[in-house]
A protein has these predicted regions:
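Short loop/turn segments immediately following beta-strands, especially the blade-tip
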Residues: 85-92, 188-195, 276-281
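Blade-level signature of beta-propeller repeat domains, shared across WD40, Kelch, NHL, RCC1
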Residues: 254-292
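Hydrophobic alpha-helical segments and helix pairs
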Residues: 90-156
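Short, solvent-exposed loop/turn segments at conserved positions within beta-propeller repeat blades
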Residues: 38-39, 133-141, 180-183
């Protein structure tokens, strides 16, 4: 990537950046874009100019969150781990292996972590998927909340074949989630302190394709990466906008930039720059790793 990529980012056109990269878990933090590449077991950062920096990891990372202490929480298959971010960022990741924090569903070897992020209170909320996924696969995936204060708590949500699209309303009281093997996005009432969910209900049903990653903007609208398109939904579930994309295998949309008004969509073929239509994102809550 070079200066041309930076100009394209400012222009807000649907253009692929780093087309050879598998961009998963895309998010904005500390004035940089960050993502993981599950295929190469690496974490990347990019300041929207020049080449991205890369740190190889012992295992593939499917989700991650930044911590209040400056560390990063990594989701690696069956484990949540902590890793240090040295100065400059990523310098320390390759030198010391991540430190395991908690095993996830160790009695069920058929699952692995598939998606996750922090809720508005700084807890890490994530889901699992069947490790060997096929269309209409077995629904053995679950949803969890992790914090240092309470440890790992399972959320009382329906099992899924592949958990995706985990995100939260601006006030943190509604959780959105989806099963990538189904054509629907669901929502529920969410109590972060008690790790309690209630009133699970349909948010949106897809006519075609499958829902993957999602994010919520400052106006409470949900942006969903689906099979070859990005869809924006109103808080009541009405589809407001649908933009086709050249990549079928989309991963996650994210807002970034100094004003959180730049919209990128990760995919198995790089990042796609989109016109957000004036929408702005919300900053990710930092994982609270200082509570005991």
């Amino acid at each position: 990537m070079d200066g041309t990529a930076r100009q394209d980012l400012a222009a807000g056109v649907a253009k692929a950046i780093a087309p050879d990269a598998h961009v998963a878990g895309l998010r904005w933090h500390a004035d940089r874009w960050w993502w993981s590449d599950p295929d190469s077991a690496a974490l990347y950062l990019w300041n929207a100019a020049g080449a991205p920096l890369r740190s190889r990891l012992p295992d593939s990372v499917t989700a991650f969150a930044f911590c209040q202490s400056g560390r990063v929480l990594l989701a690696q298959a069956k484990w949540l781990c902590f890793a240090d971010l040295a100065a400059p960022p990523l310098e320390g990741l390759g030198r010391r292996p991540p430190q395991p924090a908690v095993a996830v569903d160790p009695a069920e070897p058929r699952t692995a972590i598939s998606d996750g992020g922090t809720d508005r209170a700084g807890n890490f909320v994530f889901g699992t998927a069947a490790a060997s996924r096929t269309p209409g696969g077995t629904a053995i995936g679950s949803f969890y909340q992790y914090s240092l204060r309470h440890g790992l708590r399972r959320l009382a949500l329906p099992t899924v074949a592949a958990a995706h699209g985990i995100c939260f309303s601006p006030d943190g009281r509604i959780m959105y989630f989806s099963d990538a093997s189904a054509r629907r996005i669901q929502q529920c009432d969410y109590d972060a302190g008690a790790a309690r969910v209630a009133n699970v209900r349909l948010f949106a049903e897809l006519a075609e394709g499958q829902p993957r990653g999602a994010t919520v903007d400052s106006g409470g609208c949900l942006w969903s990466a689906q099979s070859g398109r990005l869809v924006r939904y109103a808080p009541d579930g009405a589809a407001l906008r649908s933009e086709p994309l050249p990549s079928v295998h989309l991963t996650r949309p994210a807002f970034g930039g100094p004003g959180l008004d730049q919209l990128l969509v990760g995919s198995a073929g790089g990042m796609h720059v989109m016109d957000g239509g004036g929408a702005r994102g919300l900053p990710d809550a930092l994982f609270d790793d200082r509570k005991t």
